Regions:
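Predominantly a Rossmann-like dinucleotide-binding segment in NAD(P)-dependent oxidoreductases
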Residues: 1-33, 38, 149
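Electropositive phosphate-/nucleotide-binding environments in soluble metabolic enzymes
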Residues: 9, 13, 105-108, 133
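NAD(P)-dinucleotide binding in Rossmann-like oxidoreductases
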Residues: 34-44, 51-112, 125, 157
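C-terminal helix-rich "cap/oligomerization" subdomain common to oxidoreductases
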Residues: 52, 116-159
Length: 159
């Protein structure tokens, strides 16, 4: 009741935002299933996504897992990147050859940037509002899909 919308909204929204940021494009269609366990909000949700240029993605948000676990896998033409609980690995062959990858150093500090944007109307917002809007559009489309038993739902583009 106090969650603000369930696990997909609370935790999954951050992952959805990251996935769209990594892909560099929005999701256009979604299919989702959720389990509420007799509560008002989703506890576990499985989401299938189709990106604007045809790429596919999946997301599982598990609110009743015995421990925290976070994993993102991106498969491409020259291998895959696996982010697992804070570590990034590049897997380079089907045999599993891999090496740890250092995260790129950035000068961006989202909190400092947010404060600067409040103080200075001419400051550049490095996290534009459209990122949040796309995440909300996708989250709400996933909720509609789950309510319809997993029916494929088009993700609206309001901006």
């Amino acid at each position: 009741k106090l969650s603000g919308g369930g696990q997909l909204n609370d935790s999954g929204s951050h992952l959805l935002d990251i996935i769209m940021w990594i892909a560099g494009e929005p999701v256009v269609e979604v299919s989702a299933f959720s389990d509420h366990f007799d509560t008002e909000v989703d506890i576990n949700t499985a989401v299938k996504m189709k990106f604007q240029r045809g790429g596919l993605g999946t997301l599982s948000v598990v609110g009743d897992a015995p421990r925290w676990w976070e994993e993102i896998m991106i498969v491409g033409s020259v291998g895959q990147l696996l982010y697992r609980n804070g570590e990034l690995t590049h897997i380079t062959s089907i045999e599993g050859a891999s090496y740890q990858v250092a995260f790129p150093q950035t000068s961006a500090n989202p909190v400092a940037n947010f404060i600067e944007c409040i103080r200075n109307p001419k400051a550049v917002n490095h996290t534009p509002a459209v990122c949040g809007l796309r995440t909300i559009e996708l989250t709400e489309a996933a909720w509609r899909s789950a309510a319809a038993g997993g029916k494929v739902v088009k993700v609206p583009r309001t901006a």
